[in-house]
Amino acid sequence: MKQNSAKFIVIEGLEGAGKSSAIALVRDFIEKHNGVPPVCTREPGGTPLAERIRDLVKIADPNDPLCDESECLLIYAARAQLVANVIKPALAQGNWVLGDRHNLSSLAYQGGGRQLMPLVEAVSQATLKDFKPDLTLYLDIDPQLGLQRARDRGALDRIEQQALSFFERARATYLQLAARDESIVVIDASQTMAQVHKEILAVLQRQDWS
């Protein structure tokens, strides 16, 4: 595989959209395409420091509640660490990278959900500049259905416990951003898993991976 052929693919979506199964599908596709598995990451997280930040963001501390601005800045600190120490080095070595969330999550969740878009855009530009995925698959689902699926999995984390209106704003932002960026493909995640996977494979197969 040529070094300049390495791609960065990201799976995005609200809680309960089916990201985990989609990631497994795309990972298998990449491994069959390249003969080697991709480097898999998750956000926030993916490095020892970023995983510690993940715990701060995901686990509520009733004695020291995390304010919205701190949440945003912590997530970008984790992302900057991951991009610098894992994603960019992997791509430079010719390895494909498959991400469970990336910057689009912050634009949707902190920018739309928390209504902090000016802060998110400023920090995004400062930390990432023009770095972005080659392809993002956004699994779109009605927030009520997604949250019910998340509840069925078990206890909800701090982010998953946010009000329905938070996720409605996040979804609206996801769709607005997807409408103006051709590298973001919207997949209807309310379908059966088989239908969702069929759509994902169709998207992957029609990409120019040269």
UniProtKB/Swiss-Prot annotation:
PROSITE patterns reported for this sequence: THYMIDYLATE_KINASE (PS01331)
Reactions the enzyme catalyzes: dTMP + ATP = dTDP + ADP
Source domain of life: Bacteria
Keyword check for tRNA processing: no
EC number: 2.7.4.9
Residues annotated to bind ATP: 13-20
InterPro entries for this protein: P-loop_NTPase (IPR027417), Thymidylate_kin-like_dom (IPR039430), Thymidylate_kin_CS (IPR018095), Thymidylate_kinase (IPR018094)
MF terms (GO), sorted A to Z: ATP binding; dTMP kinase activity
Gene Ontology cellular-component annotations: cytosol
Family membership: Belongs to the thymidylate kinase family.
Function noted in UniProt: Phosphorylation of dTMP to form dTDP in both de novo and salvage pathways of dTTP synthesis.
Protein name per Swiss-Prot or TrEMBL: Thymidylate kinase
Organism encoding this protein: Shewanella loihica (strain ATCC BAA-1088 / PV-4)
Gene name of this polypeptide: tmk
